[in-house]
Amino acid sequence: VQIFDRVENGEMPPKSDDMKPADRKALLAALEPSLHAASKAETDLHGRGPMRRLNRLEFEQNLRDLLALPHLDIRDMLPADRESRHFDKVAATLDISHVQITAYLDAVETALRQAMVTSPAPPASKKTRVVGRKLGPRGSVGGHESMFYARDGKGLASLTAKEQEAAWTKDEPDLEMTLFRSPGWPYAVFPAKILATATGEYRVRFSARSVLQTTGFVLKKGVRTVPMTFRSRKPTGHDQAEDVRMTGGIIDVRPEGGVYETTVYLPAGQTIEYGMLGLPTPQIDAQGKTGYYRYPPFPEGGQPGIAFQWLEMEGPIAPASWPPASHRVLFDDLGADVKSAKPAEDAKRLLRRFIARAAREPVPAEAIPQFDKIVLDALQKGTP
């Protein structure tokens, strides 16, 4: 086709007088029908765009939709996709190797295991409420201007390690935990004893107000809303933090205060970290002139922030039905224990049901028996 185009444009032969106009016209007329027919046949068979595999983000999203797992996270199990001109959806660069095939199979197995449940009932729900110093860490993170506890609108001095141990045995509901910084590094600001007992969604309620920090750590009523979010993370120090992700959406905390509610998604063993938005991130003072942290000068009128009075988390929230939708995608109405009076018959039915859901185009009937054999062999051997 490229040669045809160059001949048609007079670029070939190199010298224009090597081919007479009549010969050029005759050559093009002879080649055009066959080239057009070949191009049309290829387009009819494969489409106009080149076929490519899904990149890892698309693959993850497809598994989420297929298995009804909206929070499935398997992207990092797959090798990073090559890019072309900053795009990772170019067919020529989306090659595939045995390493990727192995990673894809591992990711799919992980997703299938997450989709299945084995318990006859959802995990038990638990409610935990914290007040006072249990709303945050024992010490400030980023200097005293960044975070402190307050009573009656006045900031309290930092406690010694011995005083902290004694203070943490009390609830002190009259204290507020005030936060005037956005996340950065180092940063580990999360409530005590708030922990996900099982992977799932949790309902979070808290009482808070937006405030202004003025000279001497004195609090004034805020003059605008302060946006915040939560971040899922392990309850570890900042040097051990990993897999930190925003959850629960954006919440605007008002000056008049109130009770706010959101839903967060947490893997088992994780907690929620406060994530103020648009506030300073104190930097370590490398020159050592102002102490360990360098908090920027306050805006006129005071530094905006949020004061928290209490926080509670309840969950995991049970799905509307049990087993959940992801389990029913695989096993339909066979229940959490997957018991069947006719295992072979149900296995074939579920296989065809899943193929119809997963396939992008009709699957020929003659292609299915080979998968029947795999499933029935596994049933006979008792393979889980």
Model region roles, listed by residue range:
Residues 2-11, 19-384:
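Low-complexity, glycine/serine/threonine/alanine-rich intrinsically disordered linker
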